[in-house]
């Protein structure tokens, strides 16, 4: 069925294919580095879209010699820019993008697989991220084993699995009744605030739900599908057992570069150096989430009224939309800029892991993207959880209720239907993390930091799981 490495004198050759989003690229590249750098004889070809490469979404420097890079076309090599405003036009634009990526991606990756075979460097296993089921199809066409790299917590994988396997009606009913809850096998009690937003029919991105159904159905076509997950055994032990045994769950995280040498400097680091230990709020909502103008105003008010020093990262998201389509986030806060600059610092980019490991950081106000969530745990930093969409809702619940490293903001729906967290609520959460329960939250965060470090070092749970996965392809 599959290429057996016994016929290849050079060891296993893994093909990694990642969806063109930062939350997929970062953990994929880290896993590729670990395979190429720590597993004897393993080689990796890391394939990202041409658009991701052109936007410099990852670095090709300082990688093992056995890791090489390749590209595939997603049909939008200059980047996908949507001019969609309505839900219908947004759905159509995204659908067209996914269809074109499937068509062009299959063409270019087919060439890559065939070229490597001709040069006697055949791939022996394909690893792909969420939303790329066509890569699994391509692997089957070439009789190659494949593994899904799930870049969210195993708890979220379990929710999607159960939704599509017997619990769809129950979860949908719960999602439409705000006061109700549901208990899925081996998972904590869930409310509508906790489930991935794609499952809620009223959510503007609910049209993406079929892509996750396709993902689960694709896995079921395999006899014993393997799912590599960016988590570690000690973090989600109950959720590991919530999926049927024929789905082989392989926790290999946290897939972060656990650096201890922070030689990089910048103006923001010099600014942090002047602040007292655990005194600074670090605020970041990632590279995708765009806050409404009303929400930005409330956040500005909260930061100004708290009078605590803060470092706020507002990334440039203009590449996602056509020019002048909407007011930039930085422009939205211009009327508050003078007051903000008196207390804190607003930057367009920072080395987040470097910042989270700075002695001055006392709290991370985060959108709860999974990479950021893991970085908060690995750095031992308490959080104010401020989720926006998809898995971030569940990540926020895990941080607050299960791992107990912070608090989650309580949003409210205004008359016009807009969901906003007001400044008073943001301030309340900040004070709880920085003052009222600071010692408790930091103690819990430090515990997870130590467990994460143990998991990835030689002999740790994630190290051993990854080695066992590679051994299957030796």
From Swiss-Prot:
Answer yes or no on keyword Glycosyltransferase: yes
* Gene Ontology molecular-function annotations: UDP-glucosyltransferase activity
Matching entries from PROSITE patterns are given as: UDPGT
A Gene Ontology annotation in the biological process aspect, one of them, is: response to toxic substance
EC number, as in UniProt = 2.4.1.-
The protein's matches in CDD domains, at most eight in alphabetical order, are given as: GT1_Gtf-like (cd03784)
Q: Does the keyword Glycosyltransferase apply?
A: yes
Keywords (alphabetical) are:
Detoxification, Glycosyltransferase, Transferase
- Which residues hold UDP-alpha-D-glucose? 287, 350-352, 367-375, 389-392
Described purpose of this protein according to its UniProt entry: Glucosyltransferase that glucosylates kaempferol. Can glucosylate the phytotoxic xenobiotic compound 2,4,5-trichlorophenol (TCP).
Spell out the family assignment given in the record's similarity comment: Belongs to the UDP-glycosyltransferase family.
Instruction: Give the matching PANTHER family.
Output: GLUCOSYL/GLUCURONOSYL TRANSFERASES (PTHR11926), UDP-GLYCOSYLTRANSFERASE 75D1 (PTHR11926:SF1533)
* Name this protein carries in UniProt: UDP-glycosyltransferase 75D1
């Amino acid at each position: 069925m599959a290429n057996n490495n016994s016929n290849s004198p050079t060891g296993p050759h893994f093909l990694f294919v990642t969806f063109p989003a930062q939350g997929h690229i970062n953990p994929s590249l880290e896993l590729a580095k670990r395979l190429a750098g720590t597993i004897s004889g393993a080689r990796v070809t890391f394939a990202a879209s041409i658009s991701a490469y052109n936007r410099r979404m990852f670095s090709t420097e300082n990688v093992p010699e056995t890791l090489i890079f390749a590209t595939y076309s997603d049909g939008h090599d200059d980047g996908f820019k949507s001019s969609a405003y309505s839900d219908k036009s947004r759905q159509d634009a995204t659908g067209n993008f996914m269809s074109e990526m499937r068509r062009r991606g299959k063409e270019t990756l087919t060439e890559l697989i065939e070229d490597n075979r001709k040069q006697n460097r055949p791939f022996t296993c394909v690893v792909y991220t969420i939303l790329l089921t066509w890569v699994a199809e391509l692997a089957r066409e070439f009789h190659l084993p494949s593994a899904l790299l799930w870049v969210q917590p195993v708890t979220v994988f379990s929710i999607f699995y159960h939704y599509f396997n017997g619990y769809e009606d129950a979860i949908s009913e719960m999602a439409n009744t705000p006061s109700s809850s549901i208990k899925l096998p081996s998972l904590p009690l869930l409310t509508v605030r906790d489930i991935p937003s794609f499952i809620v029919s009223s959510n503007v991105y609910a049209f993406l739900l079929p892509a996750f159904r396709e993902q689960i159905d694709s896995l079921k076509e395999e006899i014993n599908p393997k799912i590599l997950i960016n988590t570690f055994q000690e973090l989600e032990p109950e959720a590991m057992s919530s999926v049927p045994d024929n789905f082989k769950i392989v926790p290999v995280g946290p897939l972060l570069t656990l650096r201890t040498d922070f030689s990089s400097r910048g103006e923001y680091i010099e600014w942090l150096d002047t602040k007292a230990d655990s005194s600074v709020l670090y605020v970041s909502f990632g590279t995708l989430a765009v806050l409404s103008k009303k929400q930005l105003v409330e956040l500005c008010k909260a930061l100004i009224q708290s009078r605590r020093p803060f470092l706020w990262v507002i990334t440039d998201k203009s590449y996602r939309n056509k020019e002048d389509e909407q007011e930039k986030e930085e422009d939205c806060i211009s009327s508050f800029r003078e007051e903000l600059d008196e207390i804190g610092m607003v930057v367009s980019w920072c080395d987040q892991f470097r910042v989270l490991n700075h002695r001055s950081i006392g709290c991370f106000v985060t959108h709860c993207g999974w990479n950021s969530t893991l970085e908060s745990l690995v750095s031992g930093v308490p959080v104010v959880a401020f989720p926006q969409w998809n898995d971030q809702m569940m990540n926020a619940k895990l941080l607050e209720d299960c791992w107990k490293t912070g608090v989650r903001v309580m949003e409210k729906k205004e008359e016009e239907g807009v969901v906003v967290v007001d400044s008073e609520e943001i301030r309340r959460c900040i004070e709880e993390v920085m003052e009222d329960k600071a010692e408790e939250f930091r103690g819990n965060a430090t515990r997870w930091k130590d467990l994460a470090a143990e998991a990835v070092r030689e002999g740790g749970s994630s190290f051993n799981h990854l080695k066992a996965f590679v051994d299957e392809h030796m």
